[in-house]
Amino acid sequence: MLPGLDVRTAGRTLVAPGAVHLQAYLPIESQKQLVARCLELGAADAGFYTPIVRGGHPMSVRMLCLGRHWNALTYRYEDTRADIDLRPVPGLPEELATLAGRLAEDAGFAMNPDICIVNWYSAGSRMGTHQDKDESPESIAAGAPVVSVSLGDTARFLFGGLRRKDPVQPIFLESGDGFVFGGPARLRYHGVSRILTNTGPQGLGVQGRLNLTFRQF
């Protein structure tokens, strides 16, 4: 983990079979360390960028890929940023992989994370409901979880079912929260409908919301 990074769990909510919300998982000092690390990685070569999706439209979030690059045009993971600038993808730092593994374990899963996508949300950013299904068939079939860490402003997160038309449950993810879904919940639809501005902790070192999502390819 990052030096001195501590974890705790103030609350653990089973949202659905295979989906766990870990409230207040990271104390404030650990959040600050993690924010600083993300901004450091994002300022380096092959750092934060704005993805352009099919149809030529920019996404409303800035993105940083570690371990493998997610191509917004092909929906595939790659070793280079083929749809952006052809730069090689930065590796996933060991301390971040360790954090993801700890979160997964605390939610009842085992995983070997090798991908992290950091999404940087501003006040008007959204993320439409979607399934995370671009990982390997073996990983998805095994139910290897998606592990999420929220930093900064609170997000109104939508968690749905296995069909796009299924009802969604709104969940407010606050700074320091973890959210893990795998097993029977691995292919549930999810998204972000709103960012609640100026709700993050004072002195965190970031405006908006950083969301780290870890996966096992």
What do the predicted segments below correspond to?
Residues M1-F217:
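Non-heme Fe(II) oxygenase metal-center motifs and adjacent flexible, charged/small-residue loops
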